[in-house]
């Protein structure tokens, strides 16, 4: 059986890695004038629309566990987490910046898998990847996400704007993510016990 090649990040360098990961992320939103590959992104929302900006961070060991969370799924989740804040304010997410803190345990191939999930979610939601940064991390994988979106300023809603008798809607199954996490954590403990059995 042929062993998969593991490419260390040092072999391609920071800029080579960025080029490799952002290849194929062509801007689709009309408000994106310049995307990844320059010193800064350039965006121009439609006239009269407000720009919304939101930042999220995902930390290995806190927000996800790579023992049971595939990198492709993590990439998808990261985009969804970032976009949801923009959507919650009744705006359309249009651009995303992703900054990574990468530990030495991850290879170029692992990061490509992460970016496959990011690309899928961006295409699905019509979001352009317009930039980011990559640095070494001593504490595991760290994702920093900045989402931009736009909406007519009079249509933007905020948490503080809710009033009595307003209709409040939720989507998805309440508690399902928590229950799934509990099951995964249980399976992780079972696997650890099987891996390191104690003699009785």
Per-region residue spans from a language model:
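Helix-biased detector of long, well-ordered alpha-helical tracts
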Residues: 1-200
């Amino acid at each position: 059986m042929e062993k998969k090649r593991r490419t260390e990040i040092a072999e391609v360098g920071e800029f080579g890695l960025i080029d490799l990961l952002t290849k194929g992320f062509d801007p689709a939103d009309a408000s994106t004038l310049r995307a990844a590959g320059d010193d800064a992104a350039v965006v121009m929302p439609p006239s009269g629309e407000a720009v919304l900006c939101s930042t999220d961070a995902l930390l290995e060991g806190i927000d996800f566990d790579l023992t049971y969370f595939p990198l492709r799924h993590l990439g998808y989740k990261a985009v969804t987490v970032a976009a949801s804040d923009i959507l919650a304010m009744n705006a359309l997410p249009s651009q995303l910046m992703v900054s990574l803190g990468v530990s030495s345990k991850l290879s170029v191939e692992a990061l490509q898998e992460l970016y496959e999930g990011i690309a899928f979610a961006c295409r699905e939601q019509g979001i352009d990847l317009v930039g980011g940064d990559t640095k070494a991390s001593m504490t595991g994988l760290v994702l920093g996400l900045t989402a931009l979106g736009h909406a007519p300023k009079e249509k933007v809603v905020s948490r503080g704007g809710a009033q009595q008798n307003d209709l409040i809607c939720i989507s998805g199954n309440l508690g399902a993510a928590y229950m799934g996490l509990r099951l995964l954590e249980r399976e992780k403990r079972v696997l650890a016990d099987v891996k390191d059995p104690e003699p009785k």
